Amino acid sequence: VYFNKDLADINEAEAATLAGVLPAPSRYNPVYSAANAEMRRGYVLARMEELGYIDEPTFAAAMALPMESRLYGAAVELNAPFVAEMVRSEMLKRYGEGTYTDGFQVVTSLDSRLQKAANYSLRNGLLEFTRRRGYYGPIRNIELTDEILAAEFTEWPIEIREMLEQYAPGGLSVALVTAVNDDNTASILFRGGVTAALPWGGIKWARPFIDRETRGPEPETAGDVLSVGDLIYVMPTTRGTWALAQVPRAQGAVVSIDPSDGAVTALTGGFDFTTSKFNRARQAFRQPGSSFKPFIYSAALEYGNTPATVVLDAPVVISSSELEAVWRPINYSGRFYGPTRMREALVRSMNLVSVRLLLFETGVGNAVRHISKFGFGGAALPHNGSLALGGGAASPLDMAQGYATIANGGHAVKPYVIDAIYGPEGETLYRAAPAVVCDECIPAEPEFEFPTETEFDGEEREEMTLDEMADIVNVYRPDATVDPELFANVNVAPQVISPQNAFLVQDMMRDVVKRGTGRRAMALGRQDLSGKTGTSNDRRDAWFGGFNADIATIVWVGYDDDQPLGPGEEGSRTALPIWVEFTRMALNGVPNHQMPMPEGIVSVLIDR
């Protein structure tokens, strides 16, 4: 593993290194803690000489050898640790401890190109976010005397060399400032004594962090930011230089799935898996804010409204025992816009229109029943007016599943990551059989009338019979008697909302991208993208979800302890750029692909 040799071929120094690892494999790891490993190697060699296993010349020769090792073995083709942990957990449930010893092979649904794009875009987005919040300061400051600075690096105190060998999250590097120069550069030192220059262009961003709402003044010199002895994080730039960096305190997630069958093609659940294994893509249940509004609008369409329906954007005052004594939702802008078409309200993310659609056009009970078809349940669906503003709790994976249903024309698909499992002899133990979108398998028109009357009584919802619930859920199933040959070996995804409903929601969300809160996505130069921003109360969560017919992708950014992200950190600024960067790479060279207009839709020009 460390020396790429058989045990019979290692020398005395290498043998002592391996023996030294045993008491504390992490502390004495020769790859990641070379200074510790070298010190421990010396102790083992001294004991070998003392006990007569080696003579003095052999001891001296072994001590003189440099500590050179690296990891050998199969190269990691794809960095997807959060998915790997999901797979490990599932394999343990299926096969127990044999998971580690029986030689299973697991094939996942990941697309390596998309996974790399997810890793890259989330890392860059979080690093950019933390720059905007200000510089937190060095990891620590180390007293560097003139004597230390003048010595060879191998003669530096072992404690300092150990600090340079500590793990750096997210692909950053640990460096030590050895000089702050008059030309506004800094001299830095890496593990092993490697030196480099840190230019002013990589330092000048570092306005001091004061609190979550305040930063200090812009630095004028490198000395305003750095001091000799500062232990810092740095990162390489595209110009071949180094830049000052810091580990983001905020976290994030990116999830992308194939709308045609639910295959998870990319997933990353945080900035760095080694320092935090909590998978925010799957395990973080956060308020989706306005990114939930497309589901409210879908419910409104189901109950007799159209994108041209005019709704009054005016104050709403609600008395509710489940909310505050009196609930007065407001628009983000604090203004009221009067009569507004549904399409324009979604484009401008008007909160009051969403509330009125839920309470006065659809009804909470009807909306909950409709939205549950997208895969939501429980905490995601509060039975009160806060539902209109995304006041429930959903994971990024939940949101991706819901957006995929809109993207694929109304079919319910379930996300999955394990495509196949093979045994030690290559035998197939499991192969996924996901429900797939099969438009040819579905009758063009549903065989029932859409409900148009609104029910408001929550108690009636609880007293409904199973037959009545089935009538309202209106899930259309394919009829195998029509074209039985289409159904051979096909697990067809059920149509849970009509193609017309899905198309209209897509179309309104496309306008969000073209001229609304998601217009930064127009930088991609595509015409097939639909999406929606989301920002929860006090800017504690920033979201963007978007799709075309090929991919549905959700981005979330927030703090694990639910503190606010800070002034100006809405979905359009914090999450959307990550989504744009991911989508640029994911759809590079892929032609525009959007759902065709289904029968039953009439396009009419509306005079604004």
Language-model segments: residues:
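Second-shell loop/turn segments in exported
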Residues: 1-6, 25-35, 44-45, 49, ...
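Soluble non-cytosolic domains of exported or imported proteins
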Residues: 9-16, 31-42, 53-57, 74-86, ...
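Acidic/histidine-enriched alpha-helical segments
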Residues: 35-37, 50-68, 134-145, 251, ...
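Active-site SXXK
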Residues: 48, 118, 261-262, 282-313, ...
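Short, glycine/proline-biased beta-turn/loop segments that scaffold the active-site neighborhood
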Residues: 66, 231, 283-339, 415-435
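A penicillin-recognizing enzyme superfamily signal
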Residues: 108, 112-115, 121, 152-159, ...
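Active-site-adjacent helix/loop patches that line small-molecule binding or acyl-intermediate pockets
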Residues: 110, 311-316, 329-376, 381-408
